[in-house]
């Protein structure tokens, strides 16, 4: 399978001396780090610190973000959970240093194509594949992402998993990513443009993601559901349906793992059932889902709610997948502790398909001090409601309790 790409790739000059005379030795401006089971040559991280001490990956000659380790951990856990064979074919579309694709190869298996349009990234990928002794199963590639995906359509090779992890929005790649997939396959997509996704820049939200948004207290969940809606609409137009298996918001990015099936009928059912609207009362913080924009209740204040969408209104994570993934991490002692914490919360959240509530905002409306979140969750559960913290916001909870019930408990606790 990889021989097809090796023949095409021979047109690219294979000259390791561009960076170093010895491909497995880091130069003075590089270092070798370990993430998961992988060793990696990367630009020396300390050279790219801001004045406030934070790392700025965009300054590096080849992009490597140490803060995205949870995203890469979850990629490995997700594939170990869903792939029934080690003999699958995957593409790391925007590979940078190659870390995600190399970790998949080492920690899960499969045959991979690690691609980046930047020639400098291509050489890093080549070196890191060699450093991890994966030459037999992984191939570095140097091509514009959409061009590569469209080439695959005519190659007769079907892909089982494609990972899209851009710097910014994934929108330029979404339409192309479905075309070379097998009849049933998986994709992992990241979006780091949280500002438009969470309505910080409403004009960009409209142009890029097709929604006239407003500021809400559940902005991170709005970002997640808006991204899913956009992917669902684009995939349905091409005859594909998506099912979110795992979805999260962490630090600066949204990350979704989706099952994809080639079926117009399933795509129709999905668009009909899972795309709808959110109604929201800014003064009282009441909110909810509706399939039709005209089918909304009035706010308790007597005002009309704001309605926006289209938005994804079905589950964003399958409870059984989160539970299975959580069991899988017990066999992987090299994962970041935050990954395990997020998976545990995802498992609880997956059973509650409501928008999270920012307790500090709600307590501000009620003019009371915010109680301890764990105490509040216990009281909600004692009343028979499901309730949990959310991984998306440390001040937020998800619960099946109506907002009026939540307010009543808060007022009694104040």
Residue ranges: model-predicted function:
Residues 1-414:
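SAM-dependent transferase fold signal centered on methyltransferase-like domains
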